[in-house]
Amino acid sequence: MEGGCKVIITTSREPSKKTLELVNDLVNSLPGTSKIVRGKKSFITLLEEAVACGARYIAFIWERRGMPFALLFYDVINREWKPYMLKISGIKTRREFPVFISRRPPAKSAVIVDLSEGEVGDIFTEIFGYPILYSLDAVRGLFDTVVLIRRTDGYLVELLGSDLGPRASSIRIKKVVYRHV
């Protein structure tokens, strides 16, 4: 694990191959992230590893019936869960795209382009610390990863390369659930 990571990405116990592929794509595409293989580690052990890494947040990908179901965030410094949960209604891995998408080198820079102008862009900016823009034309060729957020039935989060072609998995977010923590 690298020092100086901002966000640790991990899963629930015994994740499916699809969830692991999503985690690997996220870590490869989002600079400042690192993954922790959960295994049988307790929550306290995950916190200790996050503190040792210097992470600010832990992003948990929970799954239900072998599919990613929700994305939750834990603030390591304040020792509290963030009050929102992103409910995932589906993902599309690199293998499911109609053309072959090879894995690119790890990203060194990223930007969020929020065409939905909704809350998901603000959440991603808070957690990952990337700048947020509202126009796709302004970022072509400037960043290794463009996190494009579009409005559909919920939200569609696409990870694009600097050429604005697909870089990694895309995530369909059904809704943002605010909960009492």
Swiss-Prot record:
Report disulfide bridges, numbered on this chain. Answer: none
Per the UniProt entry, what is one GO biological process?
Answer: rRNA processing
Q: Name one GO molecular function term.
A: rRNA binding
Q: Per the record's keyword annotation, is Aminoacyl-tRNA synthetase included, yes or no? A: no
Record domain Brix: where: 5-181
Report the InterPro entries cross-referenced here.
Brix, Brix_dom_Rbsml_bgen_prot
- Give the record's keywords alphabetically: Ribosome biogenesis
Organism superkingdom = Archaea
Task: Say what the protein does.
Answer: Probably involved in the biogenesis of the ribosome.
Designated name of the protein: Probable Brix domain-containing ribosomal biogenesis protein
Which species expresses this protein natively? Pyrobaculum aerophilum (strain ATCC 51768 / DSM 7523 / JCM 9630 / CIP 104966 / NBRC 100827 / IM2)
